[in-house]
UniProtKB/Swiss-Prot annotation:
The gene is porA. Residues 1-19 form the signal peptide. GO terms for molecular function: porin activity. GO terms for cellular component: cell outer membrane; pore complex. It comes from Neisseria meningitidis serogroup C. This is Major outer membrane protein P.IA.
Length: 393
């Protein structure tokens, strides 16, 4: 009898050791369709010193491409251990998965860390989401495989989960803050932007971005405020050296991404990003507003400056099991090398509805429109739609 009791206790020890481990994640996939439209306006040519009067306008439109896609499924494990005197060890391991096949081949390619938490706050090291990623949860609630058009992809381009160390303070009267440090050797701030090439039949081929040598240490900071249904967030990024290309928008493969300028990169200096987000939640109503400023200097002798200014808004309201929502984003004409780019703005609208079959399973439907102006008379437009299913566990 005593041997049986001892065996029972010993067999229960491993279960007790993992009792604080939580398994969670989301499985989401569906059908997506999209097409791309473009217009190129060529000004009259000058012949023998005389300028012609004929403007050439070329329009192109791709066929609708439809495919079954994973919408960002992932699986995660997290847990904690009480170390006594109010101190806890915390850890998390997240991994992208795909119900459409393929996907990442390395574990921990999403937010994964280990750290300590206590009255002093929380300190974590590993792949930790930055403050921009935190703020985007309110402004960009969309699920899709197409993060350019069917999500606010341009606006949220600074969202990241860098290998870093991050400290989050406890809350004081509704306020909390955070700081984050990415060492140069872990920085992804140096790379050659992705771009398209054309063959003789004008078929586009994507050449993916190439990660290069680290640019420099990267610093993040954030300030949060919450009071009842109101919430606010300020996110900041700074890198002394960052090789992010001539135009941040080129990273999203639209507009002039086929130009020779887009294929090269200029080392940027003093790259900083500021984002301010505000939200209100009451009953079934959710509102979010955000503004973002992206500043940098070029590595040339003149130290010319670049800047982009953008705004975004999202609104949703719950009617029973249905949650319709709409998002809008606008990027103003950018400033590149100290000069304003005429007609270089962009506009984006996403509208859709989630229908909850239960607390964990929902149908998701959305339609999106994105137009990026690339000069006077020139633009690239993406139209997209998706319908899918999401299950949380």
């Amino acid at each position: 009898m005593r041997k049986k009791l001892t065996a029972l206790v010993l067999s229960a020890l491993p279960l007790a050791a993992v009792a604080d481990v939580s398994l969670y994640g989301e499985i989401k996939a569906g059908v997506e369709g999209r097409n791309i439209q473009a217009q190129l306006t060529e000004q009259p040519q000058v012949t023998n010193g005389v300028q012609g009067n004929q403007v050439k306008v070329t329009k192109a439109k791709s066929r609708i491409r439809t495919k079954i896609s994973d919408f960002g499924s992932f699986i995660g494990f997290k847990g904690s251990e009480d170390l006594g005197e109010g101190l806890k060890a915390v850890w998390q391991l997240e991994q992208d998965v795909s119900v459409a096949g393929g996907g990442a081949s390395q574990w921990g390619n999403r937010e994964s860390f280990i750290g300590l938490a206590g009255e002093f706050g929380t300190l974590r090291a590993g792949r930790v989401a930055n403050q921009f990623d935190d703020a985007s949860q309110a402004i960009n609630p969309w699920d899709s495989n197409n993060d350019v058009a069917s999500q606010l992809g341009i606006f949220k381009r600074h969202d990241d989960m860098p290998v870093s160390v991050r400290y989050d303070s406890p809350e004081f009267s509704g306020f909390s803050g955070s700081v984050q440090f990415v060492p140069a050797q872990n920085s992804k701030s140096a790379y050659k932007p992705a771009y398209y090439t054309k063959d003789t039949n004008n078929n586009l081929t994507l050449v993916p971005a190439v990660v290069g040598k680290p640019g420099s240490d990267v610093y993040y900071a954030g300030l949060n405020y919450k009071n009842g249904g109101f919430a606010g967030n300020y996110a900041f990024k700074y890198a002394r050296h960052a090789n992010v290309g001539r135009n941040a928008f080129e990273l999203f493969l639209i507009g002039s991404a086929t130009s020779d300028e887009a294929k090269g990169t200029d080392p940027l200096k003093n790259h900083q990003v500021h984002r301010l987000t505000g939200g209100y939640e009451e009953g079934g109503l959710n509102l979010a507003l955000a503004a973002q400023l992206d500043l940098s200097e070029n590595g040339d002798k003149a130290k010319t400056k670049n800047s982009t200014t953008e705004i975004a808004a999202t609104a949703s309201y719950r009617f029973g099991n249905a949650v319709p929502r709409i998002s809008y984003a606008h990027g103003f004409d950018l400033i590149e090398r100290g000069k304003k780019g005429e007609n270089t703005s962009y506009d984006q609208i996403i509208a859709g509805v989630d229908y909850d079959f239960s607390k964990r399973t929902s149908a998701i439907v959305s339609g999106a429109w994105l137009k990026r102006n690339t000069g006077i008379g020139n633009y690239t437009q993406i139209n997209a739609a998706s319908v899918g299913l999401r299950h949380k566990f």
